[in-house]
Structures are given as structure tokens and as C-alpha cells.
Amino acid sequence: MSFIEKEDKAVFEAIQNEYNRQNNNIELIASENFVSEAVMEAQGSVLTNKYAEGYPGRRYYGGCQYVDITETLAIERAKELFGAEHVNVQPHSGSQANMAVYLVALDHGDTVLGMNLSHGGHLTHGSPVNFSGKFYNFVEYGVDKETERIDYEEVRRLAKENKPKLIVAGASAYPREIDFKKFKEIADEVGAKLMVDMAHIAGLVAAGLHQNPVDYADFVTTTTHKTLRGPRGGMILTKEEYAKQIDKTIFPGIQGGPLEHVIAAKAVAFGEALNPDFKDYQEQVVKNAKALADTLIEEGFRVVSGGTDNHLVAVDVKGSFGITGKEAEEALDEVGITCNKNTIPFDQEKPFVTSGLRLGTPAATTRGFEEADFEEVAKIISLVVQNPKDEAKLKEASDRVAALTSKHPLYK
């Protein structure tokens, strides 16, 4: 009997049910992954008891000699992974990492260039419902209507017209590789600083499969979960000249005590990412995404931009089969495929309805799924999306999902 089961049966039951859901469903949410048992053990360790305001060697509390070790390990491993001059591993989330950069690089009301949310950007890149859109004057760039890829000439034109103080590159639902070198050239042309939010592709960058934004940007932010396969949290990588400003802005600026148990889990995850097999994993993530995209196209789906270069596939289900993203998400959930509705470029549907789905391969790849498995996943998706009310077809789909998940159990 576990300690939780003994002390709190209601919480224990919810956790068990969530484990069963993760084990029995195929996880296709692009921002999710499955951490190792070592990462989970670090996050559930006695470090959760320790307050440690400040930074290694400069704390406001005593007894920090061991959390100093784990935090320093996280910092040094992140530096090695990405070739960064300075790293802050204390942000509790990607949003807080982004907020810290804005507070360093901008004044209230300054102009910023960021990617349109429905074209693949992120809430913190200037959405009017987010602090970023409320505090700063964001000008949006997007993708070309024909190619559905970032229109770098539009970015250049908007930069010259609006003279932003900061340009934000990075996305949450963009399936193509981003040219950070080109963004840097545009930023230099207008005297802007460049921030890259690599939250979704950090694992691909660490493995050397995508351009490393650290080589070009003044500030790089990321989450530590998603493709990086660590605990839920954030991180900032920057040049030495901004180190003191960034550190002061995180603490005492917008956070108090760091979550040292999470930082230890980050250190473990970064250690895993430094192993050679991490590159093999990331290569498989991309191969699986391509197999998923290609098979969906064969099944009659319109895939945004015609394919993928990374870990995700954006699909126009409304344009393909007349079903909304919301309806498709719900139908797929019924048969054990977890994904999320998502706006696609130039979407006419509301954000809670959408015309699209965002499908990601990192989590299932961690379980051992390969190309043939994702070809089968695509065919199951096709069966469900084209027959969302057919009970016999849904039963068939559910059985096929069960066959895949039993073949690749979670936490064997």
C-alpha cells in the first residue's frame, strides 16, 4: 500500500485513474511527454521541503549546500546541451520565463513583433487576453496563405514599418523548422533584440536536429517538458551581458523561492538529454511525425503546410471532412486517442471550436512507437473522423488503440 493510498484514498484513486488513462490511451498532445522514473523520483524527493531564495552560493536561507549542488548541475548541464553563456533554471513555467525576458528587454507599451496565435504562435507572444498583449504593443506576423510557412519577407516588412524593440520567434503549433538566422538578420536591420521561445522544439535543438537559437538570439526561453522530456517548468538561456538582469528579474522580481525538487528533476532530465540515445529518440520523434503526416495525407486529410519538419502535425479536419476540431477531439477521446483541437492559419472557427487538430509524436515515441505504429494511428484517426457516430467503427478503432498500447506499455 502506498503512502498516498493510506493517507488519502480520494487523491490516490485519481492518480491511479490518471495512470490508467495515460497507459491505455495514445497521447498525441504535442506539448506532452512521459518523463523517466528517475525524473519523477527527483521531483518527489525530500528537496520539496527546502526553501532556497536566491542562487547557488548566494542564498537568503541556511542549509542550502545540497540544493546548490543540484541547481548547479542543472545549470551546467543546460549550458552544455545548448552552448549557452548563462542559464537560469528557476522559472516555474515557460510563461514566467517569457515574462522575465519582456521585463528585461522592454518598457510598458513598447512595440514587439510576435507570431499570430492562430498561425501557430503562443498566448505569451502577444495575445490580447494574455499579459503580453495587455502590457506591450504586439504587432503580429503570420504564415503565407499558399505555403502556410512563415513569410519572412512579411516579417521584414512589418519590422521596418513598426520598428519593434523586440522580435519574438518560436511557436506552439507550427510544423516547420524556423530559420532563426533569418530572424536575427531582420532584428539587426531594425535595431531590435531577438528572443526565441523554443519550448516546443528544445529537444530537437539539443539533439542537433534543428537550428540552435542560442547562436543567434539575445534571449532564449523554453519549457523543460515537451520534447526535452523533463519536469514541467521553464528556463532562460542568454548571453553573459544580460545574466544579472535576468537573474534579478526572476528573483526577487517575479518569483520567490525556487522549486528545488523540480530543478533537481530538470538536472536529471538534462543529464538524460546529454546521453547519445537522446538523439536517437529525437530522430524517431521526427520520423514518426513524418509517417503520421504522410499517412493522413494518403487518407484524404489536408495537412497544414503539406507536412512537418518537427514533432507535430497540424490537420485541417473541417476542410477535409466537414467536422470541427472540437468534434474530432471528442470523438478521438472516446476511442482512446488524446489530442487537442487547434486553430489553423486563417481559421474561421472560434478558438473553442476550431477547424483543426494538433497532433504530436513525442509521448508515444517515448513509449516505443515507430513509423508503422504511427501509420496505424493515422488510419485509426481517419476511421474515427470520417465515422464519428458509427458505434461499430468506433468499437473497431478502440480495439486497434488497445492493441497498440498493450504492445507499448508505459513504465514497463
From Swiss-Prot:
Pathway: One-carbon metabolism; tetrahydrofolate interconversion; Amino-acid biosynthesis; glycine biosynthesis; glycine from L-serine: step 1/1. Pfam families: SHMT. One of its GO terms (molecular function) is glycine hydroxymethyltransferase activity. GO terms for biological process: glycine biosynthetic process from serine; tetrahydrofolate interconversion. Its cofactor is pyridoxal 5'-phosphate. Its EC number is 2.1.2.1. Keywords: Amino-acid biosynthesis, Cytoplasm, One-carbon metabolism, Pyridoxal phosphate, Transferase. It is found in: Cytoplasm. One of its GO terms (cellular component) is cytosol. SUPFAM superfamilies: PLP-dependent transferases (SSF53383). The modification N6-(pyridoxal phosphate)lysine is found at residue 226. Catalyzes the reversible interconversion of serine and glycine with tetrahydrofolate (THF) serving as the one-carbon carrier. This reaction serves as the major source of one-carbon groups required for the biosynthesis of purines, thymidylate, methionine, and other important biomolecules. Also exhibits THF-independent aldolase activity toward beta-hydroxyamino acids, producing glycine and aldehydes, via a retro-aldol mechanism. HAMAP family: SHMT. Belongs to the SHMT family. Homodimer. This is Serine hydroxymethyltransferase.
